Amino acid sequence: MATKIRLQRHGRKGYAFYQIVIADSRAPRDGRFIERIGSYNPNTNPATVDLNFERALYWLQVGAQPTDTTRNILSREGVCLKKHLLEGVKKGAFDEAAAEEKFQAWLKNKQASVQAIKEKDSEAARAEAKARLEAEKEANKAKAEIVAKKKAELAAAEAAKQAEEAAAAAPAEEAPATESAE
């Protein structure tokens, strides 16, 4: 039977996530499958992959053909490298201990690079949030200055109006008093 390792779409419109399945190549994309070996969520950063490593390796060894995207996923998870190393052991290029040592070194390096990417992304997010906060503080400061200036203008206008009314009221009171004195 011609088997494929393929993605089976789930989720909703605009927010797809996938099951990684072993299926007959003649079956429809989201139809019947032989075995589910993992899931893939491209909506997270970095994309989340939950994979049964041993079963994926088994199916690759018995001849299941991965699709392009699943080949990239399996390669990123190290399944393709492990298969390659095990084929080298079968051919006698090196022993199984050396193959396992190479795989563990690759895995450690891969995990370190993924961790560095996550740290870089989180640092960039923190820097962006800090920059937004500073910009907001500057904008609030500018708004506060404008409001204070308007309040000062209103207070000055009110004081001028009060002084004008007081000046108008004082001569009016004095004028009748001087007329009556004559």
Swiss-Prot record:
Q: Which Pfam families match?
A: Ribosomal_S16
Q: Which GO terms describe its molecular function?
A: structural constituent of ribosome
Q: Where is this region: Disordered?
A: 158-182
Record has Ribonucleoprotein as a keyword:
yes
GO cellular component terms, alphabetically, are: cytoplasm; small ribosomal subunit
Alphabetical UniProt keywords: Ribonucleoprotein, Ribosomal protein
Top-level taxon of the source organism: Bacteria
Q: Does Ribonucleoprotein count among this protein's keywords? A: yes
Q: Which GO terms describe its biological process?
A: translation
Question: What does the similarity note say?
Answer: Belongs to the bacterial ribosomal protein bS16 family.
This protein's name: Small ribosomal subunit protein bS16
User: Can you name the source organism?
Assistant: Parabacteroides distasonis (strain ATCC 8503 / DSM 20701 / CIP 104284 / JCM 5825 / NCTC 11152)
Q: Which gene encodes it?
A: rpsP
